[in-house]
């Protein structure tokens, strides 16, 4: 790895229960324009997806104040609703990766990220990987790379832009989920 690039994916619509995440984001990935004027997703890119859109596709809505798990996400969520954390994220990451590989070829990596407050007061919010697919976590430093990529993308992820593509870390990709 000599350089790292990250680009937000504009135009992702709000997902609803039952949506296929890979199918919804694929047209936007295909139209993605990079700083060097290249277009689209390459088979050696990593797609970082906010866990919130996976939870929406899973229909994880609840009424505010009624979540028995005590977890809820608030950014970009109507006041009367809450959104539980996505479930079975490893399986979801694998399904999304396979869907993107079928559409774009190669072996794209997928990270489903989530954000939370730092333990240290005043340090703000940080993004971590909830799950990953197509990235070799077993190689030396693999898990650290996954969280570092999630954190880098987290700087760019926003309620209106929940997907970021990272280029430049192909050496950690694998054909396995």
Model-derived features: positions:
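A structural signal for small-residue-enriched, beta-sheet-centric alpha/beta enzyme cores
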Residues: 2-16, 46-56, 60-85, 103-177
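A short aromatic-anchored loop/beta-hairpin motif
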Residues: 39-47
């Amino acid at each position: 790895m000599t350089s790292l690039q990250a680009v937000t994916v504009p135009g992702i619509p709000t997902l609803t229960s039952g949506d296929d995440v890979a199918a919804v984001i694929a047209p936007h990935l295909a139209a993605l324009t990079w700083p060097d004027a290249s277009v689209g997703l390459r088979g050696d890119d990593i797609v970082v997806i906010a866990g919130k859109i996976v939870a929406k596709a899973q229909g994880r809505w609840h009424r505010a104040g009624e979540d028995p798990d005590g977890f809820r996400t608030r950014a970009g969520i109507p006041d009367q609703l809450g959104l539980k954390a996505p479930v079975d994220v490893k399986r979801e990451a694998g399904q999304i990766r396979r869907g993107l590989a079928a559409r774009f070829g190669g072996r794209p990596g997928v990270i489903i990220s989530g954000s939370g407050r730092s333990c240290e007061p005043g340090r703000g919010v940080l993004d971590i990987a909830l799950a990953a697919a197509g990235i070799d976590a077993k190689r030396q430093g693999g898990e650290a790379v996954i969280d570092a990529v999630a954190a880098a993308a987290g700087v760019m992820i926003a309620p209106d832009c929940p997907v970021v593509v990272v280029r430049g870390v192909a050496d950690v990709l694998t054909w396995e989920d």
